[in-house]
Amino acid sequence: MIKHALSVTRDGDFAQWYQTVISEADMAEDSGVRGCMVIRPWGYGIWERIQRLLDDRIKATGHENCYFPLFIPLSYFEKEAEHVDGFAKEMAVVTHHRLIQKDGRLVPDPEAKLEEPLVVRPTSETVIGAAMSRWVQSWRDLPVLINQWANVVRWEMRTRMFLRTAEFLWQEGHTAHATVEEAQEETRKMLEVYRDFAETCLAMPVVAGEKPENERFPGAVSTFSIEAMMQDGKALQAGTSHFLGTTFSSAQDIKFQNSEGQFELAQTTSWGVSTRMIGGLIMVHGDDDGLRVPPMVAPWQIVIVPMLRDQPEDAATIDYCKSLQAELAKLTALGEPVRALLDLKAVKAQTKRWGWVKKGAPIVIEVGGRDVAGGNVSVIQRNKLYREDGKLDSRIMPRGDFVAEAAAILESIQQGLYLDARERLDSNIRRDVTDFDGLAAMFADSVKFPGWAEVSWAKPTGAELDAVVERLKALKLTFRNVPGTAAPAEGTCLFTGKPAVERILVARAY
């Protein structure tokens, strides 16, 4: 019987398991502010890898990085009614610029009230739109293709680390174009960048498609998303791309003179992913021993743990490990130099080993005196942790053989994690549900892992759509997206009985 590293299992309590992984893997912790987390070095290291790999892809599509203020005048939001309605309940607002002492406490100085309240950035369409209105005068100034890595604040009431926090980190792209066609192409292109990034780098298979009307970003003409399946069967929206039309260019006066001398409003887009991707990574790849980090986003791909015994031969063991680390650093795997760490912390080797297992380091190497004498290493692969007899699978390999195979092992781990998650996604989307009673039975409380349903619908709008959404809420379900790869709709709409026009995903979601 396997004795796992975590006290809570996925089958026993998935929500508590998720929190336990974050804690035991030293990913993050609560701060003194409700809903704001401290991202610890291992968690932030994963975010840095996400930043680096995604930033390269964003720049490869012609975008440039920039930075805009954290504080946005309230009047900017008031110009776009639908947008402000969508975020009003989540906005943090600054009203004073100074504190004073009063009765032994610090309080806002009533004499220091701002002339206009400042909203702490929930998203940047408004402030970037104001800048674009200054930058764009002629069709020659288009397109504008910019991206920002920043923090945002949305005052969430029900928070969960990495998934829903009052403050989170993200990138947000914003573009302006001369035509609808160019802007729509940009929207689809960046959705594909996200899909490829999630699947290639995070080993996280996703379904890309368009959101229904009720799930659109406030102010958007159309919203597209990538949706990932977690190990409990719920969906996670891992990234979005929005075609905004002239909603924000009209509000912020982003207009240009076309080649015929006539003035037009620019067509704009926005798109973003956040630290929510790390929450998805945990729930897609984690197991009952902690996190499993795909090698492409692992801060350290190989961790070397010397087995020291306070003996004279310890010096030789450390030298052996240092030379091994240097050898590994010369290798290339998955398109980059191998990232190898020698852990020399004054902690017992067994404690270090299990610490790195819980963190999800792809490969842990243990080196003791016998290994040095025999020219060997002991190899633990995080995706193949146990033997068939339930014991830890620590393989002894000749050092030269391991160095020769290290890159291939890392690549196999990356591919293996993806294939496992891909099989879970593909085998748990049901396409045979044809009526609402069948949908209700599929998602009955007694069903532990319902997965997702892809169903035919008539694309209702307005009050008819609102009524459908309320019926889904009773089952704790939401529409996810209309998959771009879905088969043509057949028969009638599961919700209205009208002729179906497309297929849409329905699931419980984070």
Swiss-Prot record:
Its EC number is 6.1.1.15. GO terms for cellular component: aminoacyl-tRNA synthetase multienzyme complex; cytoplasm. It is found in: Cytoplasm. One of its GO terms (biological process) is prolyl-tRNA aminoacylation. Catalyzes the attachment of proline to tRNA(Pro) in a two-step reaction: proline is first activated by ATP to form Pro-AMP and then transferred to the acceptor end of tRNA(Pro). Belongs to the class-II aminoacyl-tRNA synthetase family. ProS type 3 subfamily. This is Proline--tRNA ligase. It comes from Sphingomonas elodea. The lineage of its organism: Bacteria, Pseudomonadati, Pseudomonadota, Alphaproteobacteria, Sphingomonadales.
